[in-house]
Amino acid sequence: MNCGEGIDSRQIDELFINLDPIQAGGRLTTDAMKAVLAYGDGYSVCDHCTKPFRLDHISKPPLAEFHRDLASFLNMDVARLVPGARRGFQAVASAMVKPGDPVLLTAYSHYTEFLSVEQSKGTAFEIPADESHIITPDAAAARIEEVIKTTGKTPALMFIEQVDYQYGNQHPVSDLSKVAHQYDIPVLCNGAYTIGIMDVNGKELGADFLVGSGHKSMAAPAPSGVLATTSEWAEKVFRTTGIKGDLTGRTFGVKEVEMMGCTLMGVTSVGMMASFPHVKRRVKEFDAQVQYVNRIVDALLTIEGTKVQSEYPRKHTLTRMNTTDSFDTVAKTHKKKGFFLTSALRERGIAGILPGSTRVWKFNSYGITSEQADYIAESFIEIAEKEGLVCSR
């Protein structure tokens, strides 16, 4: 089946167990797929948009209620839909950072966090990670003191990853927030890999701003995401327009400046909303998903020379492995070179690991079943033994 001239249909999740690091949490639910068909036309949610003409006030489909439910789900006061987590970072930086302001990020901050600071003409300062690839409160405090001493300014904002994209490690956001707040620095918690995957309580984390990704972790079409904040900061980050045309005298009602007015006007918002009941249920099952990924990692570690670079035992399904001393030794003489591993996995119905990777690579097992976890674990061992690697199972 083709989707149009030259566009093949995509069947990766129908034909394979997909371990792609960034795709696992964004697989659509059946309800979201129905929403894609029903609301695929451009401004499809605008059929019943009436005064004050803003997305978060639309009652049919129930987007106004969805905005309130999202805020409650995250234990924050106000939430808005945004076109991906990056637009949440951008909105907060635009509201909080002035030219020349120092801004704290971490050694594992996503590039879009840096770009949001750059666009606001702030200056980026990174908090280093420790040897375990964790951002610690002590490191944050030391970096804050250093930045204040060298710039003469208190950082305008601190970005913290709840789970980072490089190692899939959980960082002590609550403790980091306490450190930042001692210096009156507001905190943006990046929950791109957690919101929609596991329970996230923004106020318990001490987050002033909480950003999530719909298409990465909330079973939603791309680009979609959420930006939530507390009542303390809502008026600032969701400020309404005050501009006026000098010739026409036009004004623009209650459009929010950092949101650029309405954000997700069609299939993205309804797809995200359609998946939401499923998302609320699945975050309660995250512990089982962690058990499954640990089964896979345990199996990989029986292959001599294999190391896990993420914290272990795993606390999240996104995982970074180092097989330089195992699978990469095979790649040096194999006729398929580094592609032998992903080729062998694909023959077994497993996809998603970067083709050619036999040294350092990531996978994300979120959404698999217990049986699939056992199958993946056994597949890695079978491939290793077939290629002459020693396994201690």
Curated annotation (Swiss-Prot):
Record's protein name: O-phospho-L-seryl-tRNA:Cys-tRNA synthase 1
Function according to Swiss-Prot or TrEMBL: Converts O-phospho-L-seryl-tRNA(Cys) (Sep-tRNA(Cys)) to L-cysteinyl-tRNA(Cys) (Cys-tRNA(Cys)).
EC number: 2.5.1.73
Enzyme class: transferase
Signal peptide: none
Domain of life (superkingdom): Archaea
Annotated organism of origin: Methanospirillum hungatei JF-1 (strain ATCC 27890 / DSM 864 / NBRC 100397 / JF-1)
InterPro entries named among the record's database cross-references: PyrdxlP-dep_Trfase, PyrdxlP-dep_Trfase_major, PyrdxlP-dep_Trfase_small, Sep_Cys-tRNA_synth_arc, SepSecS/SepCysS
Transferase as UniProt keyword: yes
Cofactor requirements of the protein: pyridoxal 5'-phosphate
Residues the record lists as binding pyridoxal 5'-phosphate: 85-86, 190, 213-215
Protein's UniProt keywords contain Repeat: no
GO terms classed as biological process: translation
Molecular-function GO terms, alphabetical: Sep-tRNA:Cys-tRNA synthase activity
Complex formation: Homodimer. Interacts with SepRS.
Protein family per UniProt: Belongs to the SepCysS family.
Keywords: Protein biosynthesis, Pyridoxal phosphate, Transferase
Catalytic reaction list: O-phospho-L-seryl-tRNA(Cys) + hydrogen sulfide + H(+) = L-cysteinyl-tRNA(Cys) + phosphate
